[in-house]
Amino acid sequence: MSKEKEEIKIIAQNRKAFHDYFIEETYEAGIELVGTEVKSVRQGKVNLKDSFARVENNEVILYNMHISPYEKGNIFNKDPLRPRKLLLHRHEINKLSGYVSRKGYTLIPTKVYLKRGLVKVELAVAKGKKLFDKREDIARRDAKRELEKQFKEKQLGI
């Protein structure tokens, strides 16, 4: 029996994280949500800007992830910015707490997606970039773009 490719639907991405941080390692984590939050996530009403995670009491908690209230949720809607527990294996939590205990490392969510009907968060172990690192990345990207442009012109014979 052949394995089918797992269906992944990306709901939200934190593009700013790749600009502001060096991504060391990523983990896939489940997230503890209530019913109306799941419905909002399925509609794509998630914002990862300024969100981060911490290891507290051997649990990973996600802060500042905004999930808009579900329109038809009435009294069952929760606070959009409430802390949410991430579901990881114990050995993964221990590894993450080891990373975070080192100076300069933090946990940043980079993606929220649906995998086989379940809401998942891609959590990255990240180290903050300095201003000169960001400038260096921009210069490298511009140089690469210029080289590709020259190569394309040479190919076309312009």
Curated annotation (Swiss-Prot):
Cellular compartment(s): Cytoplasm
Pfam families in UniProt: SmpB (PF01668)
One GO CC annotation: cytosol
InterPro entries: SmpB (IPR023620), SsrA-bd_prot (IPR000037), SsrA-bd_prot_CS (IPR020081)
GO MF annotations in UniProt: RNA binding
Annotated function: Required for rescue of stalled ribosomes mediated by trans-translation. Binds to transfer-messenger RNA (tmRNA), required for stable association of tmRNA with ribosomes. tmRNA and SmpB together mimic tRNA shape, replacing the anticodon stem-loop with SmpB. tmRNA is encoded by the ssrA gene; the 2 termini fold to resemble tRNA(Ala) and it encodes a 'tag peptide', a short internal open reading frame. During trans-translation Ala-aminoacylated tmRNA acts like a tRNA, entering the A-site of stalled ribosomes, displacing the stalled mRNA.
Protein name per Swiss-Prot or TrEMBL: SsrA-binding protein
Organism in which the protein naturally occurs: Caldanaerobacter subterraneus subsp. tengcongensis (strain DSM 15242 / JCM 11007 / NBRC 100824 / MB4) (Thermoanaerobacter tengcongensis)
